[in-house]
């Protein structure tokens, strides 16, 4: 993991706590990611309810509130339970353009008790912004969140 992500995950671990509400933890996580990672125009979370992703805490411009399973990059990550790292969202079949300035995107499923409970979604106005190193670092971000999230 790169030095940047090592520092970021250490900060995240200090900012979140299993005793706190999930929305508070996700809000601080979104703010930290948006502040510490460069060349982003959106960082946040969508949470699942009955095979639909609903907008959660985020940083950036206003966003799509509801995303159906299998639709767009986030819905595909939910449906396939896999990381989606998209170099150019305009070439992604069925891309949902919440912000026309977004050009690349990475989405990572978040699990609790073996189920996908949401996704971490990060957008950039730069084509090809997200590397394998970003994916590795963001997987660790998700692991930290999965350890402290308590679902009601």
For the regions a protein language model found, what residue spans apply to each?
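Short loop/turn motifs at secondary-structure junctions and domain boundaries
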Residues: 37, 98-102
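Sensory-domain boundary capping and coupling elements
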Residues: 111-124
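A short, aliphatic-rich beta-strand micro-motif
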Residues: 104-111
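Residues at secondary-structure transition points
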Residues: 3, 68, 72, 101, ...
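Regulatory loop-to-helix N-cap segments in sensory/regulatory domains
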Residues: 123-141, 148-152
């Amino acid at each position: 993991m790169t030095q940047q992500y090592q520092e970021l995950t250490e900060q995240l671990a200090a900012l979140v706590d299993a005793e706190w509400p999930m929305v508070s933890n996700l809000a601080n996580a979104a703010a930290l990611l948006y502040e510490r990672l460069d060349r982003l125009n959106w960082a946040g979370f969508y949470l699942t309810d009955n095979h639909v992703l609903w907008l959660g805490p985020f940083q950036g411009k206003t966003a799509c509130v509801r995303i159906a399973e299998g639709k767009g990059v986030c819905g595909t990550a939910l449906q396939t339970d896999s990381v989606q790292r998209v170099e150019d969202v305009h070439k992604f079949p069925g891309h949902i353009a919440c912000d026309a300035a977004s050009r690349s995107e990475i989405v990572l499923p978040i699990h609790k008790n073996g189920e996908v409970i949401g996704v971490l979604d990060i957008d950039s106005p730069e084509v090809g912004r997200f590397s394998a190193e970003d994916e590795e670092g963001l997987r660790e971000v998700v692991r930290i969140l999965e350890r402290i999230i308590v679902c009601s």
